[in-house]
Amino acid sequence: MRSKLFIAMPVILLMLLLAYPILKVSGIIEGSNADKYSVEIVQTATKADKSVCRWGLSRGKNGAIPEAGKDDVEILLKGGGMYLGDINENRMYLTFDEGYENGYTEAILDTLKEENVKAIFFITGDYFEKNDAIIRRMLAEGHSVGNHSLNHYSMPELSYDKCESEILELDRLFYNKFGQHMSFFRPPKGEYNAQVLDITKKLNYKCVMWSFAYQDWLTDSQKGADYALKTVSDNFHDGAIILLHAVSKDNADALSAIIREARKQGYEFGEPEELK
């Protein structure tokens, strides 16, 4: 009996040693170290879930492709998103963010119609509620209306379900009124993470960032149409996805000149459907 006990004791001790980390993390073993270890695990998981990629670019010169952060690009592309069209084609794409209506979208639509250019207009829930006639015109004239989320929250800060509902609810409202679903998504503030991309991909959306943008949304510090023309045209490049804010008077006034300058330089504007 004693010999059996001597044999069993090392086995029992070994099992306890192997089980110790599990017991510690689960809170079965009491003590300050165990509590600290458990808290650290929770904090790490929370930090991972709330990680944020904030889209930004270093502009290229003389037609060079802009550079974005390597990790941000990797996460974006791995998640099915994009920020460039075909960089082997001298074709660019116009996109407009519509957080609210500032009185210039009709003029922008007039110019696009006159120049025969199609664009993507990314709208929020507030824009949807207040601008029925303008959205109908966008659709009637062959433009694509993209999803910019219901409430313009920072998507990475939301739970999975809330993030999903921010996209789905606006899509549902849009479908009920206009009879079609949205195809493109642009995260508010250019903030995203792997979770956001996982959701958009699951919902059959294409997440479209941009390869050019400038500080055009500050409505109280517009710098004139000539400034807008030079700033945008200095950054033309193959496959460019251009982000302009429709609240900008400068953009509305300069849009025709921007399109004509692009064509003068040998560029053409692609259809939104090419980005799917």
Where are these regions (language model features)?
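N-terminal pre-catalytic segment of deacetylase/amide-hydrolase enzymes
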Residues: 2-94, 101-109, 113-114, 258-261, ...
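Catalytic grooves of carbohydrate-active enzymes
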Residues: 237-273
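Intrinsically disordered, low-complexity segments enriched in polar/charged small residues
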Residues: 7-9, 29, 153, 191, ...
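Metal-dependent polysaccharide deacetylase catalytic core of the NodB/CE4 family, i.e.
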Residues: 53, 89-92, 102-109, 113-243, ...
